[in-house]
Amino acid sequence: MLPGLRRLLQAPASACLLLMLLALPLAAPSCPMLCTCYSSPPTVSCQANNFSSVPLSLPPSTQRLFLQNNLIRTLRPGTFGSNLLTLWLFSNNLSTIYPGTFRHLQALEELDLGDNRHLRSLEPDTFQGLERLQSLHLYRCQLSSLPGNIFRGLVSLQYLYLQENSLLHLQDDLFADLANLSHLFLHGNRLRLLTEHVFRGLGSLDRLLLHGNRLQGVHRAAFRGLSRLTILYLFNNSLASLPGEALADLPSLEFLRLNANPWACDCRARPLWAWFQRARVSSSDVTCATPPERQGRDLRALREADFQACPPAAPTRPGSRARGNSSSNHLYGVAEAGAPPADPSTLYRDLPAEDSRGRQGGDAPTEDDYWGGYGGEDQRGEQMCPGAACQAPPDSRGPALSAGLPSPLLCLLLLVPHHL
């Protein structure tokens, strides 16, 4: 080493300055202003900063990006790095997502776009390329329709949150590519009809929530193929009748909620009543709204004599296909004109299980067991800071890097006491 350089390095301040100069070309990308970053796993947390756009110069190694509770309006291609695994954008002002925005995020596993009240439509290829996506959140937006191929190619998707939108209709085969989907949340929309092939392809579905819609008809084959479904919520709709064949296609069903519908307990109720005589499920009450002499009674508690004047019902067996030339009203179980509307229901969760003919024994699973790992979107939407991003345990994360304090400067600060 040259004598002059040796003397320079013997001065602590000079040595630190040289260290800073040498470190600059090798320094990791800086953390965006007002954000907090972690090194392991690479995480950028920028929530609740009133950002109107995604921060520039995000570290390309970022795997988790939290941008919720900002004012972001538009998403464009090239904004996000290809290493992302988790992307939270809920509770922003999103109104436009340009085609190709997520196309190169082939590693992405979770995408939360929920609670964006200005997001009224999506392009057909919005989610193209997200073959590893497992969880997609689109709750509480203003979506009134969905393109027929919007979910095409999402072969790894397990959780789909579409509740509290303004959806009026679901196209047949909308979910055809979602063979691994286990949870589908559609409650709080404006759906009026469930068609024959609306849920085709969902062979792994475990929970289907359809309460709080405006359903008037369910096709007798609407649930065909849902052989693993255990939870079905249809309460707080406008259903006066329901084809017994529809429920007969659900051999694994354990929890059924049908309350707060204007059930007609006349001859139209016989198929549903007959299904209840054979089924072993935990069910809510099914209160009769008509005819007047049966108003207030539970449909499940009716007797064979109550249907004595009805024409003989064709026997149905679980999983059997509908035969014959039936009218559309019979296929869908549509209520007659003038049926009273459903009473408003506040029972959106944790409904009591009422089933005198249901499972026996203390070891049977309860509904709470099935919901133990589910965090409602209402609670999540209020979350200002993900705990995993804001509190980094020392054994799982590297040091937090705050924007505005380059790490080489720490060296200079540590040397200050040597000169006092």
From Swiss-Prot:
Lipid moiety-binding region (GPI-anchor amidated cysteine): 390
Example of a GO biological process term: corpus callosum development
Cysteines engaged in disulfide bonds, as pairs: 31-37, 35-46, 265-288, 267-310
Tissue expr: Highly expressed in brain and liver. Expressed at lower levels in kidney, mammary gland, placenta, skeletal muscle, spleen and thyroid.
Sequence ranges of Basic and acidic residues compositional bias: 351-360
Glycoprotein in keyword set: yes
Domain LRRNT: 47-60
Pfam family, one: LRR_8
Membrane topology reported for the UniProt record: Lipid-anchor; GPI-anchor
Cellular component, GO, one term: extracellular region
InterPro entries per UniProt: Cys-rich_flank_reg_C, Leu-rich_rpt, Leu-rich_rpt_typical-subtyp, LRR_dom_sf, LRR_TM_domain-containing
Signal peptide interval: 1-46
LRR repeat residue numbers: 61-82, 83-104, 107-129, 132-153, 156-177, 180-201, 204-225, 228-249
GO MF: signaling receptor activity
Modified how: Undergoes zinc metalloproteinase-mediated ectodomain shedding in neuroblastoma cells; is released both as a full-length ectodomain and an N-terminal fragment containing the leucine-rich repeat (LRR) region of the protein. N-glycosylated.
Propeptide span(s): 391-420
Family listed: Belongs to the Nogo receptor family.
Physiological role: Cell surface receptor that plays a functionally redundant role in the inhibition of neurite outgrowth mediated by MAG. Plays a functionally redundant role in postnatal brain development. Contributes to normal axon migration across the brain midline and normal formation of the corpus callosum. Does not seem to play a significant role in regulating axon regeneration in the adult central nervous system. Protects motoneurons against apoptosis; protection against apoptosis is probably mediated by MAG.
Protein name (database record): Reticulon-4 receptor-like 2
Organism: Homo sapiens (Human)
